[in-house]
C-alpha cells in the first residue's frame, strides 16, 4: 500500500515488492482517492486472507530497527488530519542522481529529503547539504550558507515539485495505437519530402536543397508529371541560376529524374571523379564503357524523353526546326538509320562529307569515341544518340548547322568548334588546313588528349576557349567570320559551354527565352546571373555568344537549337554520370579549357570563382593538439620499471588469506595476481 504524493509518476512504482512473507503486490493510491483506496485495500486483504494487523506485523518484521508505532494507527491518524492542509506524504521513488555521487553523501541528501517529507514541510528553513556541483566547482566549494546561494539551494530542493495543482486525475490506460495493414499506397520518400517541403519557405528550401523543384501534385499521376516536367526543368534551372555551384552538384542528379523518364545512372563518387580529372580520362571518357552499353536502351528511353521534354518545353519548335534546318538533311534519314545502326549512319552524318577519316575511326568504334569525346560522339554516335538523347539530337542539329554554313571552314569536323577556335586563332591561315587539322587531331580523340592537357584540348575542342578568344576576337574579326564562326561556335558551343558552366545550362532557360528575345535576354539574364554567381566568366561567353548569334543573324531556330542542345545537355551529360558540378569542373577543363583560359582572362573573376567554390562549403576548423610540449610524454619515460618484459616477482599478499580462501592454491595465486595488477595500476596512475 503506498500513499503517493502529487508529482510521483505511477509508472515508476513497482507492481510487486519482495518483503518478508514473500512477494507483495503493490497497490498505489493517489492521495485524494482515500476512500476508494480503503475499500480496495480491504478487498485485497480479504482476497489474501489477511487483516490489517497482519500487514502491520509483517511490515514491522521486515524492519530491523526497533518496532515503529503500529502502522495501522498511523494510517488512521493520517486519515483524521484534514487532507489538504499539508501536501500529502510524498513517496520518493529511488531518485538519486549518481552524477554527484562523489560529493554528496547519499545519507545526507536523501535521508534529509525523506525527513523533510515526514515532517511534511517540503521546504524547511534548514539548508541541506547538496551536491556542490550545483554551485560551481567541487573544489572551489562555494560557501553553501551564503545568502545568494540560498535561492539556488531552494530551487534545487524544490526541483521535483510542480506548483501544486488540482489533484491529479488517475492515469487512464492510454489506448495503444493500432496500425491497420490495409493502408493505402504509402507516399514515396519523394512525396513525403515534398510534403515536408511544402511547409518550408521556398527560399529556405532552395538554400537547403539547391536546385530541387517540387512536383506540383504529389498523388497526381505520371501524366501530369510529364506535363510539368517542362516547367520543372525551367524552375530548376532558374533556381540553379540563383544558387552557387553546389547547386549544380545537386541538380546534377536531380535534373534527369526531373525530366520525366528515369534512367539508369552509374554511381560515381564525385571525389574520385575530381581526382581522376587530374590524371586520367574521366569515367565517361574511359572508353566505350558506359555510353556504349547505354545506347541501346538509352535510345528508346531518351528518345521518348527527348520527345516528352522538348515537346513540353517552350522549345517545341526548335525540335521541329531541327528537323527542318540543316539537320533535316541528316536528321531526316540518319535519325532513322541511326536507330538502325549508328555506325551505318556514320556515313550519312553531316560530319561524313567533311570527315571520312574520323568517321572511319568513329565508325570503327563510334561508341568508344562517343564515350571518349562527346564532341566526336556528338557527330559519331550522335545520330545514334540523336535518338538516344535530346542533347545529341539538339546538338546534332546545331552541329549539323554548325556544319551547315561554317561547313565552309569548320565543317570539316563537327569539332566545328575546334575549327572555330583555330579559325579564331589562325584566322589568317588557310581554312582548309584549319579544318583538316583539328578534324584529324581533335577527332583522334579530342577527349583523351583533352585530358592530357586541357590546353591542347582547348585547341581540339576549344569552344569555350573559342568563345573566350572570340570574345576578344569576335569583336574585331571580320563580321563574316564572326557570322560563320559564332554560328559554328554557338552551335557547337552551347553544348561545350553548357558543359563548361552550369550557368549556360541555367541559361538554357534564359537561352530559351533568348530564342524569343535574345538580345534582351542575353544581356539581362547572363548579367543577372553573372551577378548571382561566380561563373561570371562563363557568363561572358554566353553573352558573347548570344550576342554573336544576333550579330551573325543566326536564325532563331539555330539559336533555339543551340539552346536546345544545351537544354538537353543536362540529362545527356548526366547520363555520362557527370553532374553539372563535374561538368563545370571536369568538362570545363577537359572539354573547353575554360577554367584555364578563361581564368587567365577573367582574372579576378576566376579567382572569385575559385574562392566561391571553396567558400560555399565552409572550411572545417582543424583541431590542434593542445599542449605540444616536450614534457608531454615524460610520464612514459619516468617509468620506474627497468626490465619491461620480466614479470614482477610476486610479492606476498598484504593480508593473509583466510583459511577458507587458502583452500586451493589457485585462489591464492589469483589473489596474488590481483594484488600485483592492482599495484601496477596504482603505479600507472
From Swiss-Prot:
**Keywords, sorted A to Z:** Cytoplasm, Cytoskeleton, Phosphoprotein
**Motif segment (PxLPxI/L motif):** 647-653
Q: Which GO terms describe its cellular component?
A: 3M complex; centrosome; cytoplasm
Q: Per its UniProt entry, which superkingdom is the organism in? A: Eukaryota
The main location is cytoplasm
List the GO biological process terms.
microtubule cytoskeleton organization; regulation of mitotic nuclear division
Subcellular location(s) of the protein: Cytoplasm; Cytoplasm, Cytoskeleton, Microtubule organizing center, Centrosome
Q: Where is the composition biased (Polar residues)?
A: 219-228, 611-622
Phosphoserine PTM sites in chain numbering:
142, 146
Chain segments carrying region Disordered? 93-127, 207-263, 281-538, 558-579, 599-623
Miscellaneous section: Despite its name, does not contain a coiled coil domain.
Q: How is this protein organized at the quaternary level?
A: Component of the 3M complex, composed of core components CUL7, CCDC8 and OBSL1. Interacts (via PxLPxI/L motif) with ANKRA2 (via ankyrin repeats); may link the 3M complex to histone deacetylases including HDAC4 and HDAC5.
In the UniProt entry, what is the domain comment?
The PxLPxI/L motif mediates interaction with ankyrin repeats of ANKRA2.
Q: Report the protein's function.
A: Core component of the 3M complex, a complex required to regulate microtubule dynamics and genome integrity. It is unclear how the 3M complex regulates microtubules, it could act by controlling the level of a microtubule stabilizer. Required for localization of CUL7 to the centrosome.
Name of the molecule in the record:
Coiled-coil domain-containing protein 8 homolog
Per the UniProt record, the source organism is: Mus musculus
Amino acid at each position: 500500500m503506498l500513499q503517493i504524493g502529487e508529482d510521483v509518476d505511477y509508472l515508476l512504482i513497482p507492481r510487486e515488492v519482495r518483503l518478508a512473507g514473500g512477494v507483495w503486490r503493490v497497490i498505489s493510491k493517489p492521495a485524494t482517492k482515500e476512500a476508494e483506496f480503503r475499500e480496495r485495500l480491504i478487498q485485497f486483504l480479504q482476497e489474501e486472507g489477511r487483516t490489517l494487523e497482519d500487514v502491520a506485523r509483517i511490515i514491522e518484521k521486515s524492519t530491523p530497527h526497533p518496532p515503529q508505532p503500529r502502522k495501522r494507527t498511523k494510517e488512521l491518524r493520517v486519515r483524521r488530519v484534514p487532507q489538504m492542509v499539508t501536501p500529502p506524504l510524498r513517496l520518493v521513488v529511488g531518485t538519486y542522481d549518481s552524477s554527484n555521487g562523489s560529493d554528496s553523501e547519499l545519507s545526507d541528501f536523501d535521508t534529509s529529503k525523506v525527513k523533510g517529507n515526514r515532517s511534511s514541510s517540503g521546504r524547511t528553513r534548514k539548508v541541506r547539504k547538496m551536491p556542490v556541483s550545483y554551485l560551481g566547482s567541487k573544489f572551489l566549494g562555494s560557501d553553501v550558507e551564503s545568502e545568494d546561494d540560498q535561492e539556488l539551494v531552494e530551487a534545487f530542493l524544490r526541483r521535483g515539485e510542480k506548483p501544486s495543482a488540482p489533484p491529479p486525475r488517475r492515469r487512464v490506460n492510454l489506448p495503444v495505437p493500432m496500425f491497420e495493414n490495409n493502408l493505402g499506397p504509402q507516399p514515396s520518400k519523394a512525396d513525403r519530402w515534398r510534403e515536408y517541403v511544402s511547409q518550408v519557405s521556398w527560399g529556405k528550401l532552395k538554400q537547403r536543397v539547391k536546385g530541387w523543384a517540387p512536383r506540383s501534385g504529389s498523388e497526381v499521376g505520371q501524366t501530369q508529371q510529364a506535363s510539368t516536367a517542362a516547367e520543372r526543368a525551367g524552375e530548376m534551372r532558374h533556381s540553379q541560376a540563383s544558387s552557387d555551384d553546389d547547386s549544380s552538384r545537386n541538380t546534377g542528379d536531380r535534373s534527369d529524374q526531373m525530366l520525366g523518364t528515369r534512367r539508369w545512372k552509374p554511381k560515381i563518387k564525385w571525389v574520385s571523379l575530381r581526382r581522376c580529372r587530374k590524371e586520367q580520362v574521366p569515367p565517361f571518357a574511359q572508353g566505350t564503357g558506359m555510353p556504349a552499353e547505354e545506347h541501346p536502351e538509352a535510345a528508346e528511353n531518351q528518345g521518348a524523353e527527348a520527345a516528352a521534354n522538348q515537346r513540353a518545353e517552350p522549345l517545341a519548335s526548335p525540335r521541329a526546326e531541327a528537323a527542318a534546318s540543316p539537320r533535316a538533311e541528316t536528321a531526316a534519314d540518319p535519325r532513322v538509320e541511326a536507330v538502325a545502326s549508328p555506325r551505318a549512319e556514320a556515313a550519312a552524318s553531316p560530319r561524313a562529307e567533311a570527315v571520312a577519316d574520323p568517321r572511319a575511326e568513329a565508325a570503327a568504334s563510334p561508341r568508344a569515341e562517343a564515350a571518349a569525346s562527346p564532341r566526336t560522339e556528338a557527330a559519331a554516335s550522335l545520330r545514334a544518340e540523336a535518338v538516344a538523347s535530346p542533347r545529341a539530337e539538339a546538338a546534332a542539329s546545331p552541329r549539323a548547322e554548325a556544319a551547315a554554313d561554317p561547313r565552309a571552314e569548320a565543317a570539316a569536323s563537327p569539332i566545328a568548334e575546334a575549327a572555330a577556335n583555330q579559325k579564331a586563332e589562325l584566322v589568317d591561315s588557310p581554312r582548309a588546313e584549319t579544318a583538316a587539322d583539328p578534324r584529324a587531331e581533335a577527332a583522334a580523340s579530342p577527349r583523351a588528349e583533352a585530358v592530357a592537357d586541357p590546353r591542347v584540348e582547348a585547341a581540339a575542342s576549344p569552344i569555350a576557349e573559342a568563345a573566350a578568344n572570340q570574345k576578344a576576337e569576335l569583336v574585331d574579326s571580320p563580321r563574316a567570320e564572326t557570322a560563320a564562326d559564332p554560328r559554328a561556335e554557338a552551335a557547337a558551343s552551347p553544348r561545350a559551354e553548357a558543359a563548361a558552366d552550369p550557368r549556360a545550362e541555367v541559361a538554357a532557360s534564359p537561352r530559351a527565352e533568348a530564342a524569343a528575345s535574345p538580345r534582351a535576354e542575353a544581356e539581362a539574364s547572363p548579367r543577372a546571373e553573372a551577378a548571382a554567381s561566380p561563373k561570371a566568366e562563363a557568363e561572358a561567353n554566353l553573352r558573347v555568344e548570344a550576342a554573336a548569334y544576333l550579330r551573325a543573324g543566326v536564325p532563331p531556330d539555330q539559336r533555339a537549337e543551340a539552346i536546345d542542345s544545351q537544354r538537353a545537355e543536362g540529362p545527356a551529360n548526366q547520363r555520362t554520370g557527370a553532374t553539372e558540378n563535374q561538368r563545370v569542373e571536369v568538362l570545363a577543363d577537359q572539354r573547353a579549357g575554360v577554367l584555364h583560359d578563361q581564368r587567365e582572362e577573367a582574372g579576378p573573376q576566376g579567382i572569385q570563382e575559385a574562392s566561391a567554390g571553396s567558400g560555399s562549403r565552409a572550411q572545417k576548423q582543424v583541431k590542434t593538439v593542445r599542449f605540444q610540449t616536450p614534457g608531454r610524454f615524460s610520464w612514459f619515460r619516468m617509468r620506474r620499471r627497468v626490465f619491461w618484459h620480466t614479470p614482477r616477482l610476486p610479492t606476498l599478499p598484504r593480508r593473509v588469506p583466510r583459511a577458507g580462501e587458502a583452500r586451493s592454491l589457485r585462489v591464492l595465486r589469483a589473489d596474488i595476481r590481483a594484488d600485483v595488477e592492482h599495484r601496477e595500476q596504482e603505479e600507472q596512475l
